[in-house]
Curated annotation (Swiss-Prot):
Compositional bias ranges of the Basic and acidic residues kind: 375-404
Post-translational modification: Farnesylation is required for nuclear envelope localization.
Chief place where the protein resides: nucleus
Gene expressing this chain: BROX
Classification via Pfam families: BRO1 (PF03097)
Superkingdom per UniProt: Eukaryota
Protein name: BRO1 domain-containing protein BROX
Membrane topology: Lipid-anchor
GO CC annotation, single: nuclear membrane
Lineage: Eukaryota, Metazoa, Chordata, Craniata, Vertebrata
Residues with lipid group (S-farnesyl cysteine): C408
Subunit structure: Monomer. Interacts with CHMP4B. Interacts with CHMP5: this interaction allows the recruitment of BROX to cellular membranes. Interacts with SYN2; this interaction promotes SYN2 ubiquitination and facilitates the relaxation of mechanical stress imposed by compressive actin fibers at the rupture site.
Amino acid sequence: MTHWFHRNPLKATAPVSFNYYGVVTGPSASKICNDLRSSRARLLELFTDLSCNPEMMKNAADSYFSLLQGFINSLDESTQESKLRYIQNFKWTDTLQGQVPSAQQDAVFELISMGFNVALWYTKYASRLAGKENITEDEAKEVHRSLKIAAGIFKHLKESHLPKLITPAEKGRDLESRLIEAYVIQCQAEAQEVTIARAIELKHAPGLIAALAYETANFYQKADHTLSSLEPAYSAKWRKYLHLKMCFYTAYAYCYHGETLLASDKCGEAIRSLQEAEKLYAKAEALCKEYGETKGPGPTVKPSGHLFFRKLGNLVKNTLEKCQRENGFIYFQKIPTEAPQLELKANYGLVEPIPFEFPPTSVQWTPETLAAFDLTKRPKDDSTKPKPEEEVKPVKEPDIKPQKDTGCYIS
């Protein structure tokens, strides 16, 4: 289902040469610097390469991160940091703040920023794959897995590496914990969307589908709440998307809960549940329009134009009409004024992030190699200020053309 998921832009970064004239005193140190430069450039290239797959991304990321670890961790695995942690200035933009970059003289800042982009790549890969016209079951599983991997990376960055930063992120920057938490939750919610679509296709019990939809709506509500204190200028569009998805899946929950109530001969309550679904679906449609008119980072997706979205509208309408007919012929039950409380708990299909760890330090790092970096030889005028050649150019992301919508993005 092309463009069903909202995506913020990739982070952009200034080139890094890893040239330390005078400091590097041996061939092994020189080789590490060359390998860092080339592996970083290769990883950045893959972010916008449409032929890149998860295996290629993992190999390229592991190659760079294992080398970068030597700038962060001591070789004896003690808690002491590497003497090289603060040797290089790194400069990155943020997904919500346009092309206004942040810079820190800290390899941990680089590790988190690049890791963040790797997680974003997995979300964009999942979105592209979900947009294929005739997606196979294996591809659907890969969409599901990619979103869980992304959630795991974001979670690991937030819990294990953000606390290590010397300079905490400013409000609304990517490395602020609230922002990363919103990405974690969104990835979980979108992975559960795949589960729901699969459950609908396989005609699982309405009670299970209702519970999954309700849990997914709660995820979207939680992500939206996490962003509530950010400036609307850069968060409004993303929040509209989260809000419309919350309304959409709450409508799904009420629709399938209505089917469950009807099966239990509670026709009056079923009608009220479906009326609530109808109201929420209309609200989701209105929010789709508002989302399309809201300015902000990322390309505008069009959920209301998708068959998967429209199918729910037809399902609500037909099921409500069926319940009203049954009530007029058989049950004659009073329709409650209040919508039923959704106290649904899914026992199956809930998404947890796939645990993530950065690779261990490359075997190229030895005590002798580390000793070949002599910090006493740093030039006197070596300053933390970004050099003129470190201009941060926006990432040119490939356009993804919508394909014919089959309405079945996980079959």
